[in-house]
Amino acid sequence: MTPSAPSQPVRVAALYRFARLDAFEALRAPLAAFCCGRGIKGTLLLAHEGINGTVAGSEEAIAELIDHIEAIDGLAGLEVKFSSATDMPFHRMKVRLKREIVTMGVEDIDPATSAGTYVAPADWNALISEPGTIVIDTRNTYEVSIGTFKGAVDPATASFREFPAWVEAHRAELEGRKVAMFCTGGIRCEKATAYVKSLGFEDVFHLKGGILKYLEEVPAEQSLWQGECFVFDERVSVSHGLAEGDAELCRACRHPLTASELTSPRYAAGVSCPHCFDARTDEDRQRYAERQRQVELAQARGKRPHIGS
């Protein structure tokens, strides 16, 4: 990746807002032009239910983008988490139109009007430490594998679409309990609370700003977070204070890897890792090895490798 100038670190903004956008299609081209004109890269998703995305650029450009989005009818009060990166973590800018800004696949769920109760990061420890509270990680299992809250339940989902089925299967376990949910930036758990409330549960809570806001605001010595938080860009993970983490990504299967997994005999950079080794053939590994060789050659020539990110 192309290094950023030391005097201008890259500003990363993870943002979302559930709001009724009847003419969301018309926002696509102007938003893309606005971002591209300021060197902003990343992805923004637009749907009838609102906006979601992560973008990066100079501090000035990101501030201008947030102001621009909040000036759009219905999008004031955008939920934003800021962090920094030493290099630009995205390859290009994309603005996409979707059926949902976070895909659950359940009709008639409206987080804008029926989400659970927000819990500020400063109050989160007290809630999840209460006897009888069930704490649910609404992220996918590959994200959970490198970090989660102490005592949290992992539904072991491969995608957010599987979450409603998990809730239905464990409905009896939730009865009569406080249900506290969390996710990376707040969007999935906010939608999850709306779904759980639609089933008749009342004591439903979610971490405002998600794990990212918690790691930003809660000191490490007081934290109940264990491990690192997976993020969907080239940083791979962040830790307390939103410092870039130590996790790396298997370029063969896209699974995040901890430091111990990187020492596994089944790990080869760009070729395989403990999570995908058994699922690959020798032919697959030979193909990935050749791709990795090309990546390393490009890096040696000072070029920026691109392998689909």
UniProtKB/Swiss-Prot annotation:
Name of encoding gene: trhO
Name the source's superkingdom.
Bacteria
Key words of the record: Oxidoreductase, tRNA processing
Keyword Oxidoreductase belongs to the record: yes
Single GO molecular function: oxidoreductase activity, acting on paired donors, with incorporation or reduction of molecular oxygen
Write out the GO biological process terms: tRNA modification
Name the chain's protein: tRNA uridine(34) hydroxylase
What residues does the Rhodanese domain cover?
129-223
Q: Region (Disordered) spans which residues?
A: 288-309
Sequence similarity: Belongs to the TrhO family.
Q: What does this protein do?
A: Catalyzes oxygen-dependent 5-hydroxyuridine (ho5U) modification at position 34 in tRNAs.
